[in-house]
Amino acid sequence: MEFCPKCKSLMIYQGDKLVCRKCGYEKEADDSEELVIKVERNKEDVPVIEGENLKTLPTTKAICPACGHNEAFWWLRQLRAADESEVRFFRCTKCGKTWREYD
């Protein structure tokens, strides 16, 4: 990792050069430097919504596909890529059936 000697910003590799995105300073990359990119993703625990936790969720008018009741708890969860919309989950306040709705 190298920082620009002019503006102290982080420099990035572009081909065989190091370039400062902020001020445009360029420097030949040293052959002895090896670029290693490591990406790690942490799996987050998905909270389970049940029992007393349900009573804290907002409710809305939605027809349950199982019993036809017209009220359900709802919550949003990001299941797909960050550039895609969230998934809306519903749980019937009467029978407990859970279903989802995509935008």
From Swiss-Prot:
Zn(2+) 1 binds at residues 4, 7, 20, 23. GO terms for molecular function: DNA binding; DNA-directed RNA polymerase activity; zinc ion binding. One of its GO terms (cellular component) is DNA-directed RNA polymerase complex. A zinc finger (C4-type) spans 4-23. InterPro entries: DNA-dir_RNA_pol-M_15_CS, Rpa12/Rpb9/Rpc10/TFS, TFS, Zn_ribbon_RPB9, Znf_TFIIS. Zn(2+) 2 binds at residues 64, 67, 92, 95. SUPFAM superfamilies: Zinc beta-ribbon. A zinc finger (TFIIS-type) spans 60-100. Keywords: DNA-binding, DNA-directed RNA polymerase, Metal-binding, Transcription, Transcription regulation, Zinc, Zinc-finger. One of its GO terms (biological process) is regulation of DNA-templated transcription. Belongs to the archaeal RpoM/eukaryotic RPA12/RPB9/RPC11 RNA polymerase family. Induces RNA cleavage activity in the RNA polymerase. In its presence, the cleavage activity of the RNA polymerase truncates the RNA back to position +15 in a stepwise manner by releasing mainly dinucleotides from the 3'-end of the nascent RNA. The truncated RNAs are able to continue elongation. Involved in transcriptional proofreading and fidelity. Misincorporation of nucleotides during elongation of transcription leads to arrested elongation complexes which are rescued by TFS-promoted removal of a dinucleotide from the 3'-end. This is Transcription factor S.
